[in-house]
C-alpha cells in the first residue's frame, strides 16, 4: 500500500507552498507599510 508516503509527501508540499505564500504576502505587506511610513515622514 503506497498511499501513506504519497499523501504525506503531498501534505508537506502543500504546507511548504502555504508557508511560502504567507511569507511572500507578509513581505509585500511589510513593504507597503514601510512605504506608507516613509511617505508620512
Curated annotation (Swiss-Prot):
Task performed by this protein: Urotensin is found in the teleost caudal neurosecretory system. It has a suggested role in osmoregulation and as a corticotropin-releasing factor.
Protein localization: Secreted
Disulfide-bonded cysteines: none
Principal location class: secreted
Keywords of the record: Amidation, Hormone, Secreted
Gene source species: Catostomus commersonii
Keyword Secreted included in the entry's annotation: yes
Protein known as: Urotensin-1
Domain of life, source organism: Eukaryota
Any one GO CC term of the record: extracellular region
MF term (GO), any: hormone activity
Modified residues (Valine amide): 41
Family, similarity comment: Belongs to the sauvagine/corticotropin-releasing factor/urotensin I family.
Amino acid at each position: 500500500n503506497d498511499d501513506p508516503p504519497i499523501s504525506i509527501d503531498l501534505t508537506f508540499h502543500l504546507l511548504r507552498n502555504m508557508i511560502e505564500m504567507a511569507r511572500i504576502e507578509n513581505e509585500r505587506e511589510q513593504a507597503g507599510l514601510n512605504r506608507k511610513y516613509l511617505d508620512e515622514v
